[in-house]
Amino acid sequence: MVKVRFLGHAAFEIVGSKRILIDPFLTGNPAAAAKPEELEADLILITHAHGDHIGDAVEIAKRTGAKIVAMYDIANYLVENNPGITTIGMNYGPTEVDGVKIVQVPAWHSSSDGKYSIGNACGYVIELDGVKIYHAGDTFVFKDMELLNELYGPIDLALLPIGGHFTMGPKEAAKAVELLKPRKVVPMHYNTWPPIAADPEEFKKLVGDKAEVIILKPGEILEL
């Protein structure tokens, strides 16, 4: 069994034979369901360099010894500024880390630390204990999402942004579901702040019977 806990915004904890964190933005996150010091991790996946996605990754990695997986440029930037942490830099494509299959895939978004552009944005398809999960990162919908289903499907769970303004809104995310054909979908990256206000029920209605939409509140867990 794999457990997926929504930590608020775009942050998730995935627990099976390994503990994985994705975009652990907790400090300063008004929707955060945990504190950085409460979390353990073997791997931390970062989708891009914006502060609401890198978040507390370095702090958690220093304390737990977790390996940080990120775009090559971001991985180098982090290790150069935080000696002692372990990073795995990628530039799209598949790899395997400690028994976890990871595919870093494109996302349509910018990636910077607020001053400098650092690498590209990405999403991840991960396979843990036979369960396939797609975290889209921050992105707009794009036609090549079809390839993720063709290459790595069936996807058991898709984690998709629906807040608009910086990412897909409900309409675009529903189209992404049509392209990805996942079994289950959890919306994310909405209602953290006013610019990304969105109604998850609208998204659920638009998806219809194309997938099972599960609306998680921060702190809630989905078992797969």
UniProtKB/Swiss-Prot annotation:
It holds the Pfam family Lactamase_B_3. Keywords: Hydrolase. The keyword Acyltransferase does not apply. It comes from the Archaea. Belongs to the UPF0173 family. GO terms for molecular function: hydrolase activity. It comes from Thermococcus onnurineus (strain NA1). This is UPF0173 metal-dependent hydrolase TON_1314. Disulfide bonds: none annotated. HAMAP family: UPF0173. SMART domains: Lactamase_B.
